[in-house]
């Protein structure tokens, strides 16, 4: 039998905590029993967190390595359904584990000879987190509303076709995004007239 940490690979060889081991164990059980076996065998996760969203609800964020994100997304709808059954209805979201490199300043410029890639900038990482969050729905538009006190509210327009699948999770998405990035976001399903 595999150990509970078989499905979790932490960066820098850290030990997974109890909650992460539980998620890893659940993924292992799914791999053993379900017809997702072939797809799940190659995949692992890097971290997992449980956060509170909107009062009493809890959500589980599972971080996966960026190269494996596409493979996870192929089976994500079924995987999420199975995991939500296991964890008694807590919403589960998959997000790729990305790194943000600091903006080069005059002082720090000499240290890093390489130019910072666009994919490691804060803006790019935050946008990518948003896209991972709402999968399988797609973002079709975005509006940023700056209020008089200069606080920002991001309105994200999601694909109307997926409204039935993701509408009940919209509050969770907002809570998770606020927790990870500190930004307020509202999701809408606009009717587009051509």
Curated annotation (Swiss-Prot):
Its main location: cytoplasm. GO terms for molecular function: structural constituent of ribosome. GO terms for cellular component: 90S preribosome; centrosome; cytosolic small ribosomal subunit; nucleus; small-subunit processome. GO terms for biological process: ribosomal small subunit biogenesis; rRNA processing; translation. PANTHER family: 40S RIBOSOMAL PROTEIN S7, SMALL RIBOSOMAL SUBUNIT PROTEIN ES7. The gene is rps7. Component of the small ribosomal subunit. The ribosome is a large ribonucleoprotein complex responsible for the synthesis of proteins in the cell. Required for rRNA maturation. Keywords: Cytoplasm, Cytoskeleton, Nucleus, Ribonucleoprotein, Ribosomal protein. It comes from Takifugu rubripes. Disulfide bonds: none annotated. The keyword DNA-binding does not apply. Belongs to the eukaryotic ribosomal protein eS7 family. InterPro entries: Ribosomal_eS7 (IPR000554), Ribosomal_eS7_CS (IPR047861). It is found in: Cytoplasm, Cytoskeleton, Microtubule organizing center, Centrosome; Cytoplasm; Nucleus. PROSITE patterns: RIBOSOMAL_S7E (PS00948). Component of the small ribosomal subunit. This is Small ribosomal subunit protein eS7.
């Amino acid at each position: 039998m595999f150990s509970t940490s078989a499905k979790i690979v932490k960066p820098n060889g850290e030990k997974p905590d109890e909650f992460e081991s539980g998620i890893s164990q659940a993924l292992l059980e799914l791999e053993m029993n379900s017809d997702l076996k072939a797809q799940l065998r190659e995949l692992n996760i890097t971290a997992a967190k449980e956060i509170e969203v909107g009062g009493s609800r809890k959500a589980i964020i599972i971080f996966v390595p960026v190269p494996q994100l596409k493979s996870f997304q192929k089976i994500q709808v079924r995987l999420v359904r199975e995991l939500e059954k296991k964890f008694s209805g807590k919403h589960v979201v998959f997000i790729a584990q990305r790194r943000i490199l600091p903006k080069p300043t005059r002082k720090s410029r000499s240290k890093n000879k390489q130019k910072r890639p666009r994919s490691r900038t804060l803006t790019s990482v935050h946008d990518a987190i948003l896209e991972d969050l709402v999968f399988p729905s797609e973002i079709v538009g975005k509006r940023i509303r700056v209020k008089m006190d200069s606080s920002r509210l991001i309105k994200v327009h999601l694909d109307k076709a997926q409204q039935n699948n993701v509408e009940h999770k919209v509050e969770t998405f907002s809570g998770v995004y606020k927790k990870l990035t500190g930004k307020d976001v509202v999701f809408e399903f606009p009717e587009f007239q051509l």
